[in-house]
Amino acid sequence: MGGVLSYFRGLLGSREMRILILGLDGAGKTTILYRLQVGEVVTTIPTIGFNVEQVTYKNLKFQVWDLGGQTSIRPYWRCYYSNTDAIIYVVDSADRDRIGISKDELLYMLREEELAGAILVVLANKQDMDGCMTVAEVHHALGLENLKNRTFQIFKTSATKGEGLDQAMDWLSNTLQSRK
């Protein structure tokens, strides 16, 4: 297991937690999934459908679902919402042209009753790219300041470099632990 996964082993109870990784196509969802699972970047192709992996962080078991982000696939995200403990929403911080679409998809998803209690982790990904939006810009562009009754946090990440993922997963695990 990668460093991030072994880092979480023993932290929480043994109940399997259901995590969805969502976001537009090309945001870095699959790269993040496998960076968390094996601790390194693997070659990926666009996800048509989903990838699902079982991962263990310390004592907490995760069933992590990486759902494709193409326009034609997004309507099917709702088929996976049931019993979700947390959502990792990945944003391509370098894609200024589609940040409005990302906001619309995020807000549409968060209106779903099945996700009412799910923790939200927003990853402002691709922070290593020139001209990318800052975390504050992504926060504002997504309208996160308007979220009410939702436990959430945003993190600056670079999936390819592995930056920021430990902090995000540490916050998520601590937040899940506090709900036990």
UniProtKB/Swiss-Prot annotation:
Covalent lipid sites (N-myristoyl glycine): 2
InterPro entries: P-loop_NTPase (IPR027417), Small_GTP-bd (IPR005225), Small_GTPase_ARF (IPR024156), Small_GTPase_ARF/SAR (IPR006689)
Keywords, ordered alphabetically: GTP-binding, Lipoprotein, Myristate, Nucleotide-binding
Origin superkingdom: Eukaryota
GO molecular function, one term: protein domain specific binding
PROSITE patterns: ARF
Pfam families in alphabetical order: Arf (PF00025)
GO cellular component: cytoplasm; Golgi apparatus; presynapse; trans-Golgi network
Family of this protein: Belongs to the small GTPase superfamily. Arf family.
PANTHER family xrefs: ADP RIBOSYLATION FACTOR-RELATED (PTHR11711)
Protein name as catalogued: ADP-ribosylation factor-like protein 1
Native source organism of the sequence: Drosophila melanogaster
